[in-house]
Curated annotation (Swiss-Prot):
It is a multi-pass membrane protein. Keywords: Electron transport, Membrane, Mitochondrion, Mitochondrion inner membrane, NAD, Respiratory chain, Translocase, Transmembrane, Transmembrane helix, Transport, Ubiquinone. It is found in: Mitochondrion inner membrane. It comes from Xenopus laevis. The keyword Ribonucleoprotein does not apply. It catalyses: a ubiquinone + NADH + 5 H(+)(in) = a ubiquinol + NAD(+) + 4 H(+)(out). Gene3D superfamilies: 1.10.287.3510. The gene is mt-nd4l. One of its GO terms (cellular component) is mitochondrial inner membrane. Its main location: mitochondrion. This is NADH-ubiquinone oxidoreductase chain 4L. It comes from the Eukaryota. Core subunit of the mitochondrial membrane respiratory chain NADH dehydrogenase (Complex I) which catalyzes electron transfer from NADH through the respiratory chain, using ubiquinone as an electron acceptor. Part of the enzyme membrane arm which is embedded in the lipid bilayer and involved in proton translocation. The keyword Mitochondrion applies.
């Protein structure tokens, strides 16, 4: 495992740990998910360069359309939830009201 692969894997594990430990603020959850998605996409880009497998680079084009709408939708829902409820904590989110 090269140093670049190790740094991407450790950043993904760090995002997963942050997701497990900071479950209360919605913005923290979104940032951890976004970091994990970014590291997995970087790993998908980097793997075909070292293994000379060009077919797996197509997976990036499959994952990329989900990244930007996920971030935009999450931030807009978070700002709307903060303006209506006054907090961004996850426990104040009631799914039965939706």
């Amino acid at each position: 495992m090269t140093l670049i692969h190790f740094s991407f894997c450790s950043a993904f594990i760090l995002g997963l740990t942050g997701l497990a430990l900071n479950r209360s603020p919605i913005l923290s959850i979104l940032l951890c998910l976004e970091g994990m998605l970014l590291m997995s996409m970087d790993g998908i880009v980097l793997t075909p360069l070292h293994l000379t497998i060009y077919l797996s680079s197509m997976m990036l084009y499959i994952m990329l359309p989900f990244a930007a709408p996920e971030a935009a939708t999450g931030l807009s829902l978070n700002s709307d939830h903060y303006t209506t409820h006054g907090t961004d904590k996850l426990f104040s989110l009631n799914l039965l009201e939706c």
